[in-house]
């Protein structure tokens, strides 16, 4: 999915507004994913998956850091996320549908924390961005 110049602007400006909260939101979105889609827990048998878990928060920060990297490389997502794509496809073998589930929970989390900024245009741009990231992360499954 190709991000338009307006999409790129929306994604960058939204991500800039998250400030130091990106890791917190990543953890919250991951908690939301586990609560809403319990089958996603199967990839984390060694984690304490209870609400507020330090392990979930730490992994949520990793998710947010990867997305921050992607935001900084909107014109080369495959290059920026190549190592993560390899990891998820070949070592972790995460079912690709889980990226869509997490993307949805990220959108919900961002909308909850930034309702005024979460306009239809921003929502659409973030959805396209998360979809593009998901596509890159699943590209090496083929």
Swiss-Prot record:
GO terms for biological process: hydrogen peroxide catabolic process. GO terms for cellular component: blood microparticle; haptoglobin-hemoglobin complex; hemoglobin complex. Residues 2-142 form the Globin domain. Coiled coil: none annotated. Red blood cells. InterPro entries: Globin, Globin-like_sf, Globin/Proto, Hemoglobin_a-typ, Hemoglobin_oxygen_transport, Hemoglobin_pi. The modification N6-succinyllysine is found at residues 8, 12, 17, 41. Heme b binds at residue 88. The modification Phosphotyrosine is found at residue 25. Signal peptide: none annotated. Keywords: Acetylation, Heme, Iron, Metal-binding, Oxygen transport, Phosphoprotein, Transport. GO terms for molecular function: haptoglobin binding; heme binding; iron ion binding; organic acid binding; oxygen binding; oxygen carrier activity; peroxidase activity. O2 binds at residue 59. The modification Phosphothreonine is found at residues 9, 109, 135, 138. It comes from the Eukaryota. Heterotetramer of two alpha chains and two beta chains. Involved in oxygen transport from the lung to the various peripheral tissues. PANTHER family: HEMOGLOBIN FAMILY MEMBER (PTHR11442), HEMOGLOBIN SUBUNIT ALPHA (PTHR11442:SF48). Belongs to the globin family. This is Hemoglobin subunit alpha. The gene is HBA.
